[in-house]
Amino acid sequence: MHNYLDFEKPISDLEGKIIELKKLATEDESIDTTDEIGRLEVRVREAILEIYSKLNAWQKTQVARHPQRPHFVDYAKTLFQEFTPLAGDRKFSEDAAIQAGLARFRGQPVAVIGQEKGNDTKSRLKHNFGSPRPEGYRKAIRILEMADRFGLPVISLVDTAGAYPGVGAEERGQAEAIARSTEMCLGVKVPLVSVVIGEGGSGGAIAIATGNRVYMLEHSIYSVISPEGAASILWRDSTRAREAATNMKITAEDLKSLGVIDGIISEPLGGAHRDPDSVIAATGDVIANALAEMSSRSGEQLRNERRQKFLNMGRNL
């Protein structure tokens, strides 16, 4: 069953009528609903095009958080072969919010790091709703060290509202773990390609996203804080999240114009959740092209370019 966002009501109404007509035709074969269904399907496409061609920042935030949007596990199943996840940080425990391991990407050995939110109550609790603890970032550091040692390109898929802010996480060095992971991303002498596939929330995202190439899906977001959090701090009113989202410049278009990201990956009409296979394939093509482009660069060159990229970003924004 499709989950509709509040601004998708015209689409919901039309698709609801299509479902009713199909059910009616099934119950009574003498009734021909083909023409009417065809007309309604045209209207659905028109409604989706009209709505999605002018989404505001808050609506894009809702799309980025859509419960049916493809997550890391969906990308991993399709993009990678022989994906072998590694567990634990060898210091405290395992953190399922960050999935990391070794795989083959179109025949090429790679290291993979991603954030997983889960898709039902049980898996969301297991993955802590995609909010990593220090152990997750230290696991990412393990993979980055391994990739650097064996010369494996790194692919990171970002989807988190932010690092977990619990007392236990802070006691175990959350800030230090995020800083070390960011430092390690900047220091490896292999190609690093990052893609924001949903939410890119604050340091929890950038800790695995300081890549040579950083891309965003068309309806993903990337920000220093959630719109609700910003509204609570600025106006002490979380209901002003829509206003905050607009002012924060969190959309892919905003960040491309600011030079924060290198490119935008188009999503199917109506968002990635309407056609996961096509957006996953498109993401794979972009990653493959980026890796091919960087294949002739030396390790020192890759590291220096990456560091300079983020130094320039800080100076120019």
Swiss-Prot record:
**Keywords, A to Z?**
ATP-binding, Cytoplasm, Fatty acid biosynthesis, Fatty acid metabolism, Lipid biosynthesis, Lipid metabolism, Nucleotide-binding, Transferase
Gene Ontology biological process terms, A to Z: fatty acid biosynthetic process; malonyl-CoA biosynthetic process
Q: Which domain of life is it from?
A: Bacteria
Any single Pfam family the record assigns to this protein: ACCA
Q: Where in the cell is it found?
A: Cytoplasm
Catalytic reaction(s) noted: N(6)-carboxybiotinyl-L-lysyl-[protein] + acetyl-CoA = N(6)-biotinyl-L-lysyl-[protein] + malonyl-CoA
Record's InterPro entries?
Acetyl_CoA_COase_a_su, ClpP/crotonase-like_dom_sf, COA_CT_C
Q: In which pathway does it act?
A: Lipid metabolism; malonyl-CoA biosynthesis; malonyl-CoA from acetyl-CoA: step 1/1
Q: Name one GO molecular function term.
A: acetyl-CoA carboxylase activity
Where do the CoA carboxyltransferase C-terminal domain residues begin and end?
A: 40-293
Main localization, broad class: cytoplasm
User: HAMAP family, from UniProt?
Assistant: AcetylCoA_CT_alpha
Role noted for this protein: Component of the acetyl coenzyme A carboxylase (ACC) complex. First, biotin carboxylase catalyzes the carboxylation of biotin on its carrier protein (BCCP) and then the CO(2) group is transferred by the carboxyltransferase to acetyl-CoA to form malonyl-CoA.
Give the quaternary structure: Acetyl-CoA carboxylase is a heterohexamer composed of biotin carboxyl carrier protein (AccB), biotin carboxylase (AccC) and two subunits each of ACCase subunit alpha (AccA) and ACCase subunit beta (AccD).
Please identify the protein, giving its name as recorded: Acetyl-coenzyme A carboxylase carboxyl transferase subunit alpha
Organism of origin is: Rhizobium etli (strain CIAT 652)
The taxonomy runs:
Bacteria, Pseudomonadati, Pseudomonadota, Alphaproteobacteria, Hyphomicrobiales
